[in-house]
């Protein structure tokens, strides 16, 4: 089922309605934060997201800002989360609503035509292993946000565990894990041996304002954060980082350089929040 693809990245993921520190509902999900990342990276990029039609008006500013870069598909429900920040690197989360599942019909409706597809699951059930296999069969290289490995599809306080199907890893080319997710997956310290056991060719473990580690071919490279941005809430920072990282990898950047560019983008965007006080859809 392979076809001619163009160099670039298509981001697939569910929309989310976020309630942050008790504030009014705001747009969430990777689609709400990836646009600025794709623009910064340049090249071919597209975002396809799903959510209930009655919620689409909340995401109108996203479509107004990015135009044809963003496509929103209808679904029977929209993901929902509550986030309460303790500091720039720590927060408490709960699940208000479990979002739709991406299957063959949804992939065909999105119809990605880029060499890379970045999957941005909010919970473990968003992208089943069969969907990852389908994307691989279509000829795409697949990047995957590791919160989809560890986040259980359960309402209430967010539960993270390692009970993910092993075949979720089979068709991945890049796996991104936040520090807490890496600890869950490794059942302790995440090191080169754990990376080798997972079998994904390229694994990026992020440490918030401390930077990230990149595991490739048995080696580990540390990339420091571009600069620290303090006293700002960081919703969407991981989405921006990963979308920018994958877009730069699709454009031919080496892993370390892709991480540097992604880190610089996130720092710039977080600095903007110091002045506006909220995570605009970017």
Regions found by a protein language model. Name each.
Residues 38, 178, 238:
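Short, conserved phosphate/pyrophosphate- and ester-handling motifs at nucleotide-, phospho-/glycolipid
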Residues 13-15, 240:
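Active-site metal-binding loops of divalent metal-dependent hydrolases
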Residues 36, 81-83, 211-215:
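Short beta-strand scaffold segments in enzyme catalytic cores
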Residues 1-6, 159, 189-282:
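Conserved phosphate-binding/catalytic region of the ribokinase-like
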Residues 48-50, 145, 206:
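Generic beta-sheet signal
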Residues 116, 120-192, 211:
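Conserved beta-alpha-beta core of the PfkB/ribokinase-like small-molecule kinase fold
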Residues 2-8, 16-25, 40-121, 125, ...:
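Conserved N-terminal subdomain of the carbohydrate kinase-like
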Residues 36-44, 248-251:
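Alpha-helix C-terminal capping segments
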């Amino acid at each position: 089922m392979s076809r001619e693809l163009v160099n670039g990245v298509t981001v697939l993921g569910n929309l989310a309605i976020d309630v942050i520190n008790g504030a009014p509902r705001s747009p969430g999900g990777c689609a709400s934060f990836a646009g600025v990342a794709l623009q910064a990276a340049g090249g071919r990029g597209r975002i396809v997201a799903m959510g209930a039609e009655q919620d689409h008006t909340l995401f109108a500013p996203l479509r107004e800002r990015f135009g044809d870069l963003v496509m929103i598909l209808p679904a029977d429900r929209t993901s929902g989360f509550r986030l309460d920040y303790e500091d720039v690197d720590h927060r408490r989360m709960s699940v208000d609503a479990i979002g739709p599942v991406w299957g063959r019909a949804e992939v065909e409706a999105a119809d990605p035509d880029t060499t890379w597809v970045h999957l941005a699951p909010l919970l473990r059930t968003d992208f089943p292993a069969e969907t990852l296999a389908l994307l691989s069969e279509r000829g795409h290289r697949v990047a995957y946000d590791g919160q989809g490995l560890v986040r259980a599809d359960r309402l209430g306080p967010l539960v993270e565990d390692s009970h993910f199907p092993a075949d979720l890893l089979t068709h991945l080319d890049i796996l991104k894990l936040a520090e807490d997710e890496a600890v869950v997956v490794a059942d302790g310290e995440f090191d080169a041996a754990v990376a080798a056991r997972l079998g994904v060719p390229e694994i990026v473990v992020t440490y918030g304002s401390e930077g990230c580690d990149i595991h490739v071919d048995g080696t580990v490279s540390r990339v420091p954060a571009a600069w620290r941005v303090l006293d700002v809430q960081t919703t969407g920072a991981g989405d921006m980082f990963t979308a920018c990282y994958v877009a730069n990898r699709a454009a031919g950047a080496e892993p370390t350089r892709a991480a540097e560019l992604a880190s610089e983008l996130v720092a710039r965007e977080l600095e903007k929040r110091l002045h506006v006080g909220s995570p605009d859809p970017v």
